[in-house]
């Protein structure tokens, strides 16, 4: 036990294979009440003590304390990917990286609190594919720069802060990173489409790959070869792996754009400023109009239907965005809390 730590969870490939000899690294998520330099050092020391008592596969121990999909030579190293968050950091991660945290929630390899009990990701939404951290655009940007964006704690006397860095893609990571991208994008889309937090089956993975890529079988065959290399813990991948990744992401982005057209978009909007915009509480007791003189909305489209509370400020705001009068609903009135 380490004082301040409330949760330790093993996530990633080990929770599916149960075989240390067949994984690239052992992913461990640690949640603490507070992040300190001492806590990070103590956690590393604890990992070293455990592995020294129970030598694993006659490999040299390597502790990767960065946040990101960087891999090391699994034939030489037993890598422990140690990811430490404080409670606030975990909440931020769950909000900004829902794909990762949603996946971690499936793990039953934990001590202390389950990750979902600390702060849950309830579902994957279509907007996550466009706005969340490590979305397809972020991946494509990293591939074109030949770098992987990672984060690492910077420890100083006064504080511990998380800084963004870039790791140059080497011959191993260009294949590992592309596999990570394709595998995660397909699995994340499957979670959204099925509305279930499950890993897609091998059969359905192939079907989704071909659906997304418009039945591009040559690309599918290249990915299957890449997958075999990963299973065999390859240390070097072809330069063409990057092209595979870029082509798949291009397909995926177009596929998502087409999918997004099938769904209705809901927009929640607060009323515009009023003449009593003085940081006092309005509630239902006061009913001022909005300052229309300061509003010059430039809209490419009008919305219909639009729902509004019966208050003047809400009705006037709603009329700026639609051709028809808004539908009035009492439930949208500001609460007198």
Regions found by a protein language model. Give the residues of each.
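Conserved NTP/Mg2+-binding pocket subregion across the NTase superfamily
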Residues: 40-169
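Conserved nucleotidyltransferase catalytic core and NTase-mimicking acidic/glycine-rich helix/loop elements
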Residues: 115-260
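Generic structural signal for residues in well-ordered beta-strands
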Residues: 8, 80-82, 326
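Active-site nucleotide-donor binding segment shared across nucleotidyl transfer reactions
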Residues: 2-26, 31-38
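Conserved beta-strand termini and adjacent loop/short-helix elements that scaffold enzyme active sites
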Residues: 11, 83-87, 269, 329-331
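Active-site-proximal alpha-helix that buttresses catalytic centers in soluble enzyme cores
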Residues: 263-329
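Residues at beta-strand starts and edge strands
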Residues: 24-26, 76-78, 237, 264
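Short alpha-helix plus adjacent loop in nuclease-associated cores
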Residues: 332-337
């Amino acid at each position: 036990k380490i004082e301040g730590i409330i949760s330790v969870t093993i996530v990633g490939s080990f929770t599916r294979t149960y075989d240390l000899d067949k994984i690239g690294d052992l992913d461990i998520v640690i949640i603490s009440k507070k992040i300190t330099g001492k806590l990070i050092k103590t956690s590393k020391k604890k990992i070293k003590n455990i592995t020294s008592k129970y030598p694993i596969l006659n490999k040299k121990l390597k502790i990767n304390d960065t946040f990101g999909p960087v891999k090391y030579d699994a034939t030489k190293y037993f890598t422990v990917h140690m990811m430490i968050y404080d409670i606030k950091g975990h909440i931020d991660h769950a909000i900004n990286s829902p794909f990762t945290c949603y996946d971690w929630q499936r793990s039953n390899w934990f001590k202390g609190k389950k990750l979902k009990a600390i702060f849950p990701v309830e579902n994957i939404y279509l907007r996550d594919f466009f706005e969340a951290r490590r979305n397809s655009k972020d991946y494509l940007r990293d591939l074109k720069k030949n770098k992987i964006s990672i984060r690492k704690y910077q420890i100083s006397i006064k504080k511990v802060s998380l800084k963004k860095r870039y790791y140059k893609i080497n011959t191993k990571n260009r294949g590992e990173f592309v596999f990570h991208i394709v595998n995660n994008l397909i699995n994340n889309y499957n979670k959204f489409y099925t509305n279930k937090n499950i890993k897609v089956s091998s059969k359905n993975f192939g079907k989704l790959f071909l659906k997304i890529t418009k039945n591009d079988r040559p690309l599918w065959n290249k990915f299957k070869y890449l997958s075999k290399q990963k299973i065999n813990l390859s240390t070097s991948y072809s330069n063409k792996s990057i092209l595979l990744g870029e082509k798949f992401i291009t397909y995926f982005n177009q596929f998502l754009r087409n999918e997004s057209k099938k769904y209705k978009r809901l927009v929640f909007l607060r009323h515009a400023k009023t003449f009593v915009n003085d940081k006092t509480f309005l509630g239902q007791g006061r009913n001022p109009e909005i300052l229309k003189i300061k509003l010059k909305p430039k809209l490419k489209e009008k919305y219909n239907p639009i729902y509004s509370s019966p208050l003047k400020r809400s009705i006037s705001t709603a009329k700026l965005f639609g051709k028809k009068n808004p539908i009035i609903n009492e439930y949208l009135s500001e609460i007198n809390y």
